[in-house]
A protein has these predicted regions:
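PLP-dependent amino-acid enzyme catalytic core
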Residues: 1-263
Length: 263
């Protein structure tokens, strides 16, 4: 899809845009709920705040970091990954190294190359575009980049595998009566782990990412019941429509041209 977006003539032809975090407007929209969460706290509890953010493509947590740069006094951020833990390994070791994607029960975090991390690097490297280009080109060529002095800028990280996710969903449900989806469970994991408590003072705010009804099998396995949502229940009675498209830029563009012309 990045190749498709880079074809500016095609993008202009069909009015192509994106609603995922490739589009900076998405990141800016996500800034809002960090500010909202901050002001929902009592005034005397707004110091030493750490946001715990389930993270795959680094977009959500980047929004929070930008809010911090805007002046909201957020202490830091914990990047909560699943078993696809390239960002956890980065913040632990300073090494950004590609591995095979391991499919998980938290599929939106099944990412090895976090595209929004480039945006963070740009600021971390004092807006040195040439340095960012060198880092990204080295990573693309070798699958690895070693940061000599990575400024973690208040970031820490954690990793949660599939077995732990199911356990955390159950623990959160029993303790709080809240049904967490698999991605949100990765955010709860470090908060519920007593060994992490010595690292934090103040408040930890866990960001939820999806409705648990999207993951019925995982939720049922963890707590013995399904979570439902009316908008998803309505879809069950509708006919399934699906298309198969070759995973090439030209095939995707041809598919888009055909279907955009029908709108």
């Amino acid at each position: 899809m990045k190749t498709v977006f880079e074809d500016r003539e095609f993008a202009s032809e069909i009015g192509l845009s994106a609603v995922n975090s490739i589009n900076l407007a998405r990141i800016l929209a996500q800034c809002v709920y960090y500010i909202s969460a901050f002001f929902r706290l009592p005034e005397n509890e707004r110091e030493d705040i750490t946001f715990v953010v389930p993270t795959g493509n680094f977009g959500n947590v980047l929004a929070g970091w930008l809010v911090q740069r805007m002046g909201v006094p957020i202490k830091g951020f914990r990047v909560a990954t699943n078993q696809n833990d390239i960002l956890h390994r980065l913040f632990e070791t300073g090494i950004y190294e590609l591995e095979e994607v391991a499919p998980s029960v938290a599929p939106s975090m099944d990412i090895q190359v976090a595209s929004n991390f480039e945006r963070f690097i740009y600021y971390a490297e004092d807006s040195d575009a040439d340095k960012v280009r060198e880092i990204i080109q080295t990573f693309k060529k070798t699958g690895k980049y070693v940061f000599e002095s990575l400024d973690r800028a208040g970031f820490s990280s954690s990793r949660t595998d599939d077995d732990e996710i199911s356990r955390i969903i159950k623990e959160v449900y029993l303790k709080y009566g809240y049904i967490a989806d698999p991605h949100t469970a990765c955010g709860f994991a470090p908060v519920l782990n007593p060994s992490n408590h010595s690292q934090f003072s103040g408040k930890e705010i866990v960001l939820a990412t999806a409705h648990p009804a999207k993951f019925p099998d995982t939720i049922d396995s963890a707590i013995g019941q399904e979570s439902t949502h009316h908008s998803l229940e309505v879809l069950k009675s509708r006919e399934i429509v699906k298309y198969s498209v070759e995973p090439t830029p030209e095939a995707i563009k041809a598919f888009m041209r055909k279907h955009v012309s029908q709108v």
